[in-house]
């Protein structure tokens, strides 16, 4: 800092980041009200997230009830989903080799990075309306997904 501003005393402050809730993270895990077959669950995810296609690992005939989800590039949470005994892990994108060795652990559903995050603007609008009820909150209609499908 002094090398950049040798002629003056630079002003700076350091503040510790004291998060009140230490359990916050990038993903969520929850339970369905009742179990579903793998195929029925994948079809529902495909419809809910409005995706033309989704990638998944081999179906193993398990029932799906515990669901782990991380939007965007969530592959780094795959081991946590397994550790927490999730039946399925839904994320936006994973690497090819991330699929290997997990056929008996859980179902992996990869729905696309943009597709997994496309509804967050609606969630944020709802939160902002609750905090600022007298302000207008607009949602952009621009599709920023650089990936196109044939």
Give residue ranges: language-model regions:
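Hydrophobic structural segments
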Residues: 2-150
